[in-house]
Amino acid sequence: MAFPYQCLVARSESSADGAAWTLFGASGSKIVVQSSNGVASVWSRQAVQVLDPKDDDTQEPPGKRIKLSTPKEQKFNFSSLVLSNNGHYLVGVTGEDKCVRVFQIDAQSGLQQLSERCMSRRPSAITLTSDDSTILCADKFGDVYALPLLPSPEDEQVEAPAPALPLEEKDFTPSATVFTVHSGRNRRTLEEQLKQKAKGPAKPKEAITFRHDLLLGHVSMLTDLAFAKIGNKSYIITADRDEHIRISRGVPQAHIIEGFCFGHEEFVSRLCVTRSGLLVSGGGDAHLLVWDWRNFLLNEKLPLRDTVIKHLRSRPDLSSSFKDDASFKTAVSGIWEVPGIKETSEVLVACEGLPGLFNFNVGTGAVNGDSLSLMGNPLDVAFVQTSPNSWTTIVSIDNVHKAGSTSELRENADGARLQYFSKQVDGAWREDAEMGALVSSFALGGTDGPDLTTADDKAVRDILYHVENLRKRPGAED
């Protein structure tokens, strides 16, 4: 079974001769590429050889043969892919090593890695400024950094701070005991302190030696960010786990807060700035919120939960397992604006673990949404231009887990990894079999990866599903 595409992006270029496009998909630790002319390629990180410490020749008697361990391949799975606005560069984040990787896209749509910069904390979201000069990188500790897309030699040789003098380590003894703590929160804190004592003193972190400018910070985990430019003014919009949406000025004044968009009652996981200038946000709430973000005003509340329930009721394969009660909640995993629509702004929304896409017209006062039925849970969405006036939506499908589940595995190992939809003249969405034939090699790309039948189920799930984990549990602060 091939690993699904956890990330999808596409670039399109329209001309008098037609439309050309290139599709990029991250499947585990690989990036698969296919262009409209049929050229395809796969980028993968080379295996790393590791010298077994127990076979170090400095520890062995002279004359004993040195033995190298079998080469081990370290898997660094992509969590984000972003295309530059000019279509010449691809930026990806690999979570396990916390690295931001920049690729140049050549004339044959192949990828050449230009840089690999590992952050001190795992990035949670990235985007690019409109001039493609700067990568904005948000992390799980609430900070946003600016990295040059194409660093100069000086940027790569930033002087590391001098290491602090080692302090004498004192034996740590918690002031509390299991007999003196009474709340669940304090008990968990004590348990963590005892675990840390057993591990010993923490090792000092390696200093980052490339340019990374701290722009702003939240007191909560950052979940998404967006960049917007209006006239000669630029803005950085950030969202966090504590229901906040913050509007900050762009570089170099990102420390100045313009204001906040308050209205969410649960975590905010996704932001989408439409071409019409509206901000659409979603997360753990029952509604999508539409903002006049420059004035920090809430314009609309779109009924996401009700639209999802209506969709689930209409599907015989899901209605039996669905219980329409107050405990049903949604977690937004993606919001994408549909290109090519001039009159209004339409967005497609994915909810974690639900096999459908939910579309809404924003800024029109419409109160109802619609849905597209999928064969499995959606992971990402990309749009390719097939002619000067038409676009096709490509949806990455989880072919590992059953539709509607984030834990139960499929019995059929041959599930589709992609689905394709085109918008018709009447405004309805229809499956696009023609696009499926064009990207047939892409749909099979990266199938020489790890055997998922022997993979750790939790490891696979953690790569694909993590939004619902943002929800705060009752009693967590007790």
Curated annotation (Swiss-Prot):
SUPFAM superfamilies: WD40 repeat-like. One of its GO terms (cellular component) is tRNA methyltransferase complex. Transmembrane segments: none annotated. InterPro entries: Trm82, WD40/YVTN_repeat-like_dom_sf, WD40_repeat_dom_sf, WD40_rpt. One of its GO terms (biological process) is tRNA modification. It is found in: Nucleus. Pathway: tRNA modification; N(7)-methylguanine-tRNA biosynthesis. Keywords: Nucleus, Repeat, tRNA processing, WD repeat. Gene3D superfamilies: YVTN repeat-like/Quinoprotein amine dehydrogenase. The keyword Nucleus applies. WD repeats lie at residues 14-53, 73-113, 217-258, 263-301. It comes from the Eukaryota. Its main location: nucleus. The keyword Nucleus applies. Belongs to the WD repeat TRM82 family. Required for the formation of N(7)-methylguanine at position 46 (m7G46) in tRNA. In the complex, it is required to stabilize and induce conformational changes of the catalytic subunit. Forms a heterodimer with the catalytic subunit TRM8. HAMAP family: TRM82. This is tRNA (guanine-N(7)-)-methyltransferase non-catalytic subunit TRM82. It comes from Phaeosphaeria nodorum (strain SN15 / ATCC MYA-4574 / FGSC 10173) (Glume blotch fungus). The gene is TRM82.
